[in-house]
Swiss-Prot record:
Subcellular localization(s) per the UniProt record: Nucleus
SMART domains: CYCLIN (SM00385)
GO biological process: regulation of mRNA stability; transcription preinitiation complex assembly
GO molecular-function term, one example from the UniProt record: zinc ion binding
Record protein name field: Transcription factor IIIB 90 kDa subunit
Region entry Disordered, spans: 342-371, 386-408, 425-449, 543-603, 617-653
Function: General activator of RNA polymerase which utilizes different TFIIIB complexes at structurally distinct promoters.
Similarity annotation: Belongs to the TFIIB family.
Transmembrane segments: none
Biased composition (Polar residues): 577-588
Sequence repeats: 91-172, 185-269
Taxon lineage: Eukaryota, Metazoa, Chordata, Craniata, Vertebrata
Disulfide bridges in this chain: none
Residues that bind Zn(2+): C6, C9, C25, C28
Length: 676
């Protein structure tokens, strides 16, 4: 029972069936309601043990499709791979779209394109950044936003051709017809970057008018819109007295200089370029030009046809020239006088040759004849120059009948100095002294003799020319002057703050004079004087060492070996006694360097051999212990001087190197060796 009343009978006994969703009056049987919708929230348990609300909308990329381990395990396995891909794609699209300043509608459209690419597996094997950039550029093309593919390439630092390849693939696979880009979309953007100031709108409108004219003349199809925009903006800026250089326009529209100049050249070939500024702003030509590619093809075809016609005419002219040349050669052959003497013999020899010889042999024969004729002609010419008279020639040449023809008889009269008009010049050259050199030690003044005053006046600029040249120089070096001015201002500011550091002038390196020496030793000595190898070497001691080693007396080989050995043994005994009496001296001798030269070494070897011989009856000497020097060897010149005086008083031979190094004590005193 409910509080509702039946509209048919007025009864209140109404039965509600929640399963069928209807309300029926039990009195009259009329159906009061059917398909009753319950507004309460119901939950359904799924197969995994989780619960979900009934009637809740779950999107394709929503969180409702996340798998779980069931109600007993509250551990989430995470999203599917495709859900993660879509989420990352949305994040990257919003990031790039914010940098390009795209609205939310464009971003949603780009994300829909990305979902279509993911569903068709177009992202496999391609970087996500490339696919996202292609989707954004698809939106820019379809929505008509002033963005270029080069902008996305700059943001991603990717080659523009790689992005273009991905864009074409997506457009083909997704069946999206991207419309052609209208260059007029980029004019306001580029005009704002070129900073035209108050005339920005006027320059933009003029550039748009130029672009419309280019589109009518078929310059738009197949061309990048940035190149057309750059050419239109450059012309519009010049029309409104703005000096925008080609480099400035290139830096804004992102095209190379050759492309911009090519667009200007193509526009120059149209009839619109022949109009003045006022005529262009008022008149619209109805006729359209042919596309530049078609015009270039027709020009190439005409050039090829013209080359063919010229080649045919050239062949005809060459045939006529060859016929004329043959006729001239025949006439010259007939008018040539008969040769005598050596030339006649040569002609007879040539006529006696076989007529069936090859053309190459005939050419060789003609060359030989010409050489022989030239040699005879040169002889006659030299004789005329030397002034030989006919009498002397006759006396010098007894066989005058066999003399060949003169040069005049063959070639006619030769040109003389008078006929050439150079006789005066030759006379001046002969009369002027050739050996007097010109005085080169002048007083610094220019020799202007022979130069006209008008020519000198042309070298000097007047005021207007100097002013124009100065303006040209200032315009060409404006950037350098601006940099110098900024540099001076920066230096002045640093000087005021006290942080300026003056650069020390570079010292000029003087070239050392070469070492002049007659021997290698002298050169080394001079080199050591200029630059010492080490500051720890006493070079004076080295000089004394060289003088002592070079001046040591040689051994007397004529002395009997027994006497020499006796003296050396006595010297050894005396030295042993002295060393045993003064152990400090022995230790000092051990530390002394080897000061003797090569002869002293040889003497030490000889003494060692004599001491080791059994005939003398001396005891065998034990092998000396190895000395290890732990530092620099001290040198005592006073002790060496005392020893040298003592040796001179005894009148005995020089002390050997073994004795100077304390070799007589090696292996004998164990106490001294313990110190090393």
């Amino acid at each position: 029972m409910t509080g509702r009343v039946c509209r048919g009978c007025g009864g209140t006994d109404i039965e509600l069936d929640a399963a069928r969703g209807d309300a029926v009056c039990t009195g009259c049987g009329s159906v009061l309601e059917d398909n009753i919708i319950v507004s309460e929230v119901q939950f359904v348990e799924n197969s995994g043990g989780g619960s979900s609300a009934v009637g809740q909308f779950v999107s394709l990329d929503g969180a409702g499709k996340t798998p779980t381990l069931g109600g007993g395990f509250h551990v989430n396995l995470g999203k599917e791979s495709r859900a993660q891909t879509l989420q990352n794609g949305r994040r990257h699209i919003h990031h790039l779209g914010s940098q390009l300043q795209l609205n939310q509608h464009c971003l949603d459209t780009a994300f829909n394109f990305f979902k279509m690419a993911v569903s068709k597996h177009l992202t496999r094997g391609r970087k996500m950044a490339h696919v996202i950039a292609a989707c954004l550029y698809l939106v820019c093309r379809t929505e008509g936003t002033p963005h270029m593919l080069l902008d996305l390439s700059d943001l991603l630092q990717v080659n523009v051709y790689v992005l273009g390849k991905t864009f074409l693939l997506l457009a083909r696979e997704l069946c999206i017809n991207a419309p052609a880009i209208d260059p007029c979309l980029y004019i306001p953007r580029f005009a704002h970057l070129l900073e035209f100031g108050e005339k920005n709108h006027e320059v933009s409108m003029t550039a748009l008018r130029l672009l419309q004219r280019m589109k009518r003349d078929w310059m738009h199809t197949g061309r990048r819109p940035s190149g057309l925009c750059g050419a239109a903006l450059l012309v519009a800026a010049r029309m409104h007295d703005f000096r925008r250089t080609v480099k400035e326009v290139i830096s804004v529209v992102k095209v190379c200089e050759s492309t911009l100049r090519k667009r200007l050249t193509e526009f120059e070939d149209t009839p619109t370029s022949q109009l003045t500024i006022d005529e262009f702003m008022k008149i619209d030509l109805e006729e359209e030009c042919d596309p530049p590619s078609y015009t270039a093809g027709q020009r190439k075809l005409r050039m090829k046809q013209l080359e063919q016609v010229l080649s045919k005419k050239l062949e005809e002219v060459e045939g006529e020239i060859s016929s004329y040349q043959d006729a001239i050669e025949i006439e010259l052959e007939n008018s040539r006088p008969k040769a005598k003497g050596a030339l006649a013999n040569l002609s007879k020899d040539g006529s006696g040759e076989d007529a069936t010889s090859s053309p190459r042999c005939e050419e060789d024969t003609e060359d030989e004849e010409l050489e022989a004729a030239a040699s005879h002609m040169n002889k006659d010419f030299y004789r005329e120059l030397l002034g030989d008279d006919d009498g002397s020639e006759a006396a010098g040449d007894p066989d005058g009948g066999s003399r060949p023809l003169a040069l005049e008889s063959l070639l006619g009269p030769l040109p003389t100095a008078a006929s050439l008009g150079i006789s005066d010049s030759i006379r001046e050259c002969i009369s002027s002294p050739s050996g007097d050199p010109k005085d080169s030690s002048g007083d610094g003044e220019l020799d202007l003799s022979g130069i006209d005053d008008l020519e000198i006046d042309r070298y000097i600029l007047n005021e207007s020319e100097a002013r124009v040249k100065a303006e040209l120089w200032m315009r060409e070096n404006a950037e350098y002057l601006r940099e110098q001015k900024e540099k001076e201002a920066r230096i002045a500011k640093e000087k005021e703050l006290g942080i300026y550091k003056e650069h020390k002038p570079k010292k000029s390196c003087k070239r050392r004079e070469p070492i002049l020496a007659s021997t290698a030793g002298e050169a080394i000595e001079k080199m050591l004087e200029q630059k010492k190898i080490s500051s720890k070497i006493n070079y004076s001691v080295l000089r004394d060492l060289n003088s002592k080693g070079g001046g040591s007396p040689p051994r007397d080989d004529s002395q009997p070996p027994e006497r020499a050995s006796t003296k050396k043994l006595s010297r050894r005994k005396r030295a042993t006694t002295r060393n045993s009496a003064d152990p400090g001296t022995s230790t000092g001798k051990r530390l002394r360097p080897l000061l003797s030269a090569q002869p002293a070494k040889k003497a030490a070897v000889g003494e060692a051999l004599l001491l080791s011989s059994p005939a003398l009856g001396a005891e065998p000497v034990k092998p000396s212990a190895v000395l290890v020097e732990s530092g620099p060897v001290p040198y005592h010149p006073e002790e060496d001087a005392d020893e040298e005086d003592a040796e001179d008083e005894d009148g005995e031979p020089c002390v050997s190197a073994l004795q100077m190094m304390g070799g007589n004590d090696y292996g004998c005193d164990g106490d001294e060796d313990d110190g090393y």
